[in-house]
Amino acid sequence: MTNSRETHLLMKIINHSFIELPTPSNISAWWNFGSLLGACLMIQILTGLFLAMHYISDTMTAFSSVAHICRDVNYGWLIRNMHANGASMFFMCLYLHIGRGIYYGSYLYKETWNIGVVLLFAVMATAFVGYVLPWGQMSFWGATVITNLLSAIPYIGTSLVEWIWGGFSVDKATLTRFFAFHFILPFIILALVIVHLLFLHETGSNNPSGINPDSDKIPFHPYYTIKDILGLFMMAFTLVMLALFSPDMLGDPDNFSPANPLNTPPHIKPEWYFLFAYAILRSIPNKLGGVLALLASILILLIIPLLHTSTQRSLMFRPISQSLFWILTANLFILTWIGGQPVEQPYIIIGQTASILYFMIIILLMPLAGMIENHMLKPKW
């Protein structure tokens, strides 16, 4: 008798995607982050749905409605803390997932990689509009500063900003539309995730060695489902610990004050996961130049496949490129630290140096290292 998962139309898709999927036998724990991101997305959609049932997107009541959720709604405090810290977990997994892709050369699956970059933009947009919703001081001023950057676009800039605001400043219309965007974007992300997986399953997964794994594949279930469940438990444990013991550790104290357009906070800064990009934005004194550098810092991921010069796919056997990769990682930590510091010396010069190094490693040094390693591997006779 044929198993229903092999004949039923829907079950067949699930079977070929998650059960009998041929998977390289040597993929490491770094391949766990895809499933963890899926779990994060589900957590965010569910907690967000329950928050949306009680949240009011009006400038007069938004801040109070969040306080009401935390005080009066059954387990509202937990749902809110899980949602706020779930975003941090999402970005941690996202950056590790991208780092894995760069280290092991997964970017050579160009369609999967490009959809992934689009996903990154969508997640960043969702997080940004979501941060505005509690209508605290940092929410309001963050929205004002970041949306104002669009005014740097020549000719249409000012009109574009006022169109996004729905008026001449960040106000009720802005909050209402940001709530609408924040509600719809996760479902767009969900659709993009399916496309991402569709392209991935066309080629199959990459593996740490970077060589063709077709000769040695095993079914996804039970081997990798068990491995993914372990990762899921570890992530869930970290998230619950964060939400229960230090829920405000990654937030900004300014956001405990209701939004006040007449009082600017001394240091306007985004959440920690945007600080590296914010540091790159601030490192250029010109407004338009800063905006272009900000966009380039993410869009640069799209040209990484074009900059691959090595005959080997992975960095596993390439010590020079490995060193550069870890310098790039350290550089991103420095940029994150600088993004949270005031605009004064020595932070300005450190931020500018780190920004130049960021682009230099990706555009110049990594391709150069690949060429040098190719030359070193040539037989000497």
From Swiss-Prot:
One of its GO terms (molecular function) is ubiquinol-cytochrome-c reductase activity. GO terms for biological process: mitochondrial electron transport, ubiquinol to cytochrome c. Heme b b566 binds at residues 97, 196. The chain crosses the membrane at residues 33-53, 77-98, 113-133, 178-198, 226-246, 288-308, 320-340, 347-367. Its cofactor is heme b. Keywords: Electron transport, Heme, Iron, Membrane, Metal-binding, Mitochondrion, Mitochondrion inner membrane, Respiratory chain, Transmembrane, Transmembrane helix, Transport, Ubiquinone. Disulfide bonds: none annotated. Heme 1 (or BL or b562) is low-potential and absorbs at about 562 nm, and heme 2 (or BH or b566) is high-potential and absorbs at about 566 nm. This is Cytochrome b. It comes from Caenolestes fuliginosus (Shrew opossum).
